[in-house]
Regions:
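Glycine- and charge-enriched low-complexity intrinsically disordered segments
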Residues: 1-18, 84-128, 132
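Conserved short beta-strand edge segments in small beta-sheet-based binding/regulatory domains
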Residues: 67, 135-144
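Short proline/glycine- and acidic-rich turn/helix-capping motifs at secondary-structure junctions
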Residues: 76, 114-120, 141-155
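Short acidic/polar mixed-charge low-complexity motifs
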Residues: 40-44, 66, 76
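Short glycine-/aliphatic-rich beta-strand segments at the starts of folded cytosolic domains
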Residues: 69-88
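Short, well-ordered loop/turn sites that connect or cap secondary structure elements
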Residues: 48, 54-55, 60-62
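Histidine-centered metal-binding segments
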Residues: 147-170
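Intrinsically disordered, low-complexity, positively charged segments
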Residues: 1-52
Length: 170
């Protein structure tokens, strides 16, 4: 079983070939430690130094130098749209913002899309959104939620300048 310890962002990866592809759901893509089987049958141990959310087209660098591509798996989601009158753009934006506020207030992971919000399917969340007047569709799709203010952005990017402070004599 090959071990992966580093994430290569989609931008950093470019067109480098991959040895295999992992199709992972949101929970798996957020795990710090995981074992998974690729589409070509490879078995991989993912052991990241810190929890990092993997996104579609990111890759994992294996100990032998090869790459394994990451793809978000479809999973059960709720897609919520504003419930205001059609054609009332300002009202729809305000209603969508209200839905987002209520979900964020409960620290629920969301994926923001034009005119709609996606979140993982849970009965309590579904009931909340219905009570707020949202139009709901139960779908199966890849879930790529927003990062959030406290999410680590660790993709092994170098940061080569100091953040020293300077003082003024006054």
């Amino acid at each position: 079983m090959l071990r992966a310890t580093r994430v290569i962002s989609a931008a950093e990866r470019g067109n480098r070939p991959v040895a295999d592809t992992l199709i992972l759901n949101y929970a798996q893509r957020s795990a710090q430690v995981l074992t998974a089987t690729g589409l070509k049958g490879g078995h991989f141990e993912i052991a990241l130094a810190q929890a990092t959310r993997l996104r579609t087209d990111d890759a994992l660098l294996l100990e032998d130098g090869s790459l394994v591509e990451v793809v978000a798996a479809p999973e059960p989601l709720i897609e919520a749209r504003a419930g205001d009158v059609a054609g009332n753009v300002a009202g729809n934006i305000a209603s969508l913002a209200r839905l987002a506020w209520h979900l964020g207030d409960r620290h629920i992971a969301v994926q923001m899309l034009p005119n709609r919000i996606r979140t993982r399917r849970e009965p309590g969340v579904e009931n909340l959104l219905k009570s707020l007047g949202a139009k709901l569709a139960l779908i199966e799709a890849p879930f790529e939620p927003e990062g959030g203010a406290y999410e680590s952005h660790a993709h092994d990017y170098d940061h080569d300048h100091a953040h020293g402070h300077h003082h003024h004599d006054h």
